[in-house]
Amino acid sequence: MIKAISIDIDGTITYPNRRLQENAVEAIRLAENLGIPVMLVTGNSACFAYAATILIGTTGPFIAEDGGVIGDKSNNRIFLGDMGDSMILWSELKKRYPNAEMSDTMKYGERRAGLVIKRTVPVEVVRGIIEELNLDLIAVDSGYAIHVKQPHVNKGEGIRNACQKLGITPEQVAHIGDGENDLDAFKVVGYRVAVAQAPEVLKREADHVTTKPYGDGGAEGIIHILKKFGYLEI
């Protein structure tokens, strides 16, 4: 039985320009009103996830930095990773690609569990340097940025740890996402929903694919879960 919903933010509850989609917010609040805690899961910074949690009104823990940080509305935080070899990678990348840029959240010192690079450099290039230097890192393209992190840091492990706070198992969670970095979440949860614009690799692992993209798809996914598991009448 599904007892909680975890959901990605960018591209899943937003418009393509990253503005919050009203239907998605309403669907999240409906789930919360029905007693289903919602966990926001994002590759973005903990500050971003905390603010979204407060403004949207979710009661579940938030999972930020691609699973590297778990937090709650009281702003308590648990760090599951650190920067590791990230700055070694960054130094080498800048030598070879001087136009490479970190995300703005890196510039402002908001991140603690990994490096985020703007998509001006192909993810294959980043992975190649990691392999060449034998660094203990992985690189994942979320569709919005390239996330470089320690191998144990991912959305799936973040969900596992967040579930302990809720007193449930990951198998009692339904996850909704739209990016390659949602694959690890799909591996641990009990039900998987991919939003329509998600890459094929994610859709192949989904139990359900929405007909609508972006925030409309996120809203559709939540309603689908609520109906499938008996929280709403069909």
Curated annotation (Swiss-Prot):
One of its GO terms (cellular component) is cytosol. This is Phosphoglycolate phosphatase. One of its GO terms (molecular function) is magnesium ion binding. Catalyzes the dephosphorylation of 2-phosphoglycolate. Disulfide bonds: none annotated. It catalyses: 2-phosphoglycolate + H2O = glycolate + phosphate. Mg(2+) binds at D8, D10, D178, D182. Its cofactor is Mg(2+). InterPro entries: HAD-like_sf (IPR036412), HAD_sf (IPR023214), PGPase (IPR006382). NCBIfam families: Pglycolate_arch, PRK01158.1, SPP-subfamily. Belongs to the archaeal SPP-like hydrolase family. The active site is at D8 (nucleophile). Keywords: Carbohydrate metabolism, Hydrolase, Magnesium, Metal-binding. Its EC number is 3.1.3.18. Substrate binds at K155. It holds the Pfam family Hydrolase_3.
